[in-house]
């Protein structure tokens, strides 16, 4: 079972109802939209895809040891570490605390360890913890490795699918949810990041479903495939890791 499957199995209710997750006595709360900028900035240190870094030693080492290596280098060169500060901020945001105690060290077996508010976390547990935080807050996060060339293809395919248009800035996304749901701005600002994006995605699917359905029923357009209801799980072309740009173009008749 992958970490993703394990997280969704063990914490399905917490993820669904935005409840805090208890991991080894550490309470992890879903981050609200009002703190999205700080969260995205601070969580950047736990979102690095180090497997794509062209260095065999980095690829082989655990994520926790990788962070410790960066922290040591920064302290040696600058006297302080931005990586350490961002890591601490990320934990404080997720745990909703104002102060935190973090100790990093290498044990007698050469393994990296983290003591977070008196809770000892080993290398495997840290990898699970960071992915738990990311799955709890980012609905489109996926820790599966993708071939770099295919990853580039998928990014291009995503642009094609969206007509080459950029997504509106965050302020406009908030306004869209206010208009589309009837919630006031304060309600939206208090939404967890995960729910904010899921609601936006469902609204978008509902709108397109209505347009396509009306066009089909009215005889304006004939679709090759039946129109899938917006609440049914749709197998997105981009979710298929073997989809290429050319395949997507053909499927979309571009």
PLM regions: where:
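An amphipathic, hydrophobic-aromatic interaction surface with interspersed Lys/Arg
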Residues: 1-58, 65, 127-215
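A generic structural signal for solvent-exposed, polar alpha-helical segments
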Residues: 18, 29, 69-72, 236
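Intrinsic-disorder-associated interaction segments
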Residues: 57, 79-80, 118-126, 219-224, ...
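Hydrophobic, aromatic-lined core segments that form the binding pocket/scaffold
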Residues: 85-163
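Phosphate/adenylate-binding glycine loop and adjacent helical scaffold
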Residues: 48-53, 73-82, 122, 126
């Amino acid at each position: 079972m992958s970490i993703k499957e394990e997280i969704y199995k063990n914490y399905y209710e917490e993820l669904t109802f935005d409840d805090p997750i208890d991991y080894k006595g550490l309470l992890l709360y879903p981050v609200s939209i009002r703190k999205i900028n700080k969260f995205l900035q601070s969580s950047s240190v736990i979102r690095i895809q180090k497997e794509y870094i062209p260095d065999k030693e980095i690829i082989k080492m655990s994520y926790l040891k990788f962070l410790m290596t960066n922290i040591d280098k920064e302290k040696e060169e600058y006297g302080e570490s931005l990586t350490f500060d961002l890591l601490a901020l990320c934990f404080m945001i997720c745990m909703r605390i104002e102060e935190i105690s973090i100790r990093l060290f290498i044990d007698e077996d050469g393994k990296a360890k983290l003591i977070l508010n008196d809770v000892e976390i080993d290398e495997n547990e840290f990898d699970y913890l960071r992915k738990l935080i990311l799955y709890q807050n980012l609905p489109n996060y996926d820790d599966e490795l993708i071939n770099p060339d295919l990853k580039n293809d998928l990014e291009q395919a995503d642009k094609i699918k969206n007509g080459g248009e950029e997504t509106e800035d965050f302020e406009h996304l908030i306004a869209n949810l206010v208009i589309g749901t009837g919630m006031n701005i304060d309600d939206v600002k208090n939404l967890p990041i995960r729910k904010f994006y899921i609601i936006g995605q469902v609204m978008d699917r509902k709108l397109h479903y209505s347009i396509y359905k009306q066009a089909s029923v009215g005889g304006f357009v004939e679709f090759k495939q039946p129109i899938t209801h917006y609440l049914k799980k749709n197998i997105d072309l981009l979710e298929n890791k073997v989809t290429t740009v050319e395949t997507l173009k053909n499927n979309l008749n571009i």
